[in-house]
């Protein structure tokens, strides 16, 4: 596969695709949508700080509208979907097979089977040891109360969500992770799963919630595979092709 890394301030995207043209198309889309979002939030600063759903202003760019729509059903602010939305739009601009990894929030469009590995935290026994086998179109996004740059009110080691669109997976992961606070890890995982159950089979396909020794699954995630060849580097979710 061909690959390229695009870094624009907080946006750190790795693109992998079967052709140079697909990589180039995705990279151009990342730059375009990041630039349009920067210009938009300069006019609508409340869009960045909102912790609840907000509507976009008239004339908002596609990326801002996508973020707003994705966040609304989960009751979170639009920035909860920013990484997934940019990954989704970049992958949409390319021909399969393409994998766009925006800081661990991943959009896959694959004509063949690919594996996305799970990163939890450096000291967690599952981290880098398992992956998910994916074919077709799928977004895979993770939120954590332990690592990463994104805001989370939860204490989960990782909440990984699978949805056809990465924008939805990203917003859902944030919302589910926010419910994993409290001193009782088992109760926190159960509470998060009950929330996820309201969306699985509809807006999302599955969610995996990990806090300490407690792991719970809502819905039907992709096939889980063992990564025996070594650990992946810390990037939340990392394409292992």
From Swiss-Prot:
InterPro entries: ApbE-like_sf, MA1715-like, UPF0280. Transmembrane segments: none annotated. NCBIfam families: PRK04334.1-1. Belongs to the UPF0280 family. HAMAP family: UPF0280. This is UPF0280 protein MK0206.
């Amino acid at each position: 596969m061909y690959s390229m890394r695009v870094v624009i301030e907080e946006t750190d995207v790795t693109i992998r695709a079967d052709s140079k043209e697909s990589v180039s198309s995705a990279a151009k889309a990342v730059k375009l949508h990041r630039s349009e979002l920067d210009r938009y939030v300069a006019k609508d600063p409340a869009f960045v700080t909102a912790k609840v759903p907000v509507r976009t202003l008239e004339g908002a760019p596609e990326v801002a509208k996508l973020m707003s729509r994705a966040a609304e059903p989960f009751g979170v602010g639009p920035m909860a979907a920013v990484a997934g939305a940019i990954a989704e739009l970049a992958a949409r601009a390319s021909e399969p097979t393409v994998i766009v990894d925006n800081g661990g929030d991943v959009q896959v469009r694959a004509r063949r089977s690919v594996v996305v590995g799970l990163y939890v935290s450096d000291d967690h026994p599952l981290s880098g040891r398992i992956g998910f086998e994916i074919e077709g179109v799928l977004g895979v996004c993770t939120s954590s109360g332990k690592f990463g740059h994104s805001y989370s009110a939860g204490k989960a080691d990782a909440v990984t969500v699978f949805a056809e669109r990465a924008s939805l997976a990203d917003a859902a992961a944030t919302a589910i992770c926010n419910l994993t606070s409290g001193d009782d890890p088992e109760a926190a995982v159960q509470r998060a799963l009950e929330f996820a159950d309201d969306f699985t089979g509809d807006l999302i396909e599955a969610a995996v919630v990990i806090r300490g020794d407690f792991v719970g699954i809502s819905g039907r995630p992709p096939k889980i595979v063992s990564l025996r060849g070594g650990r992946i580097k810390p990037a939340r979710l990392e394409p292992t092709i």
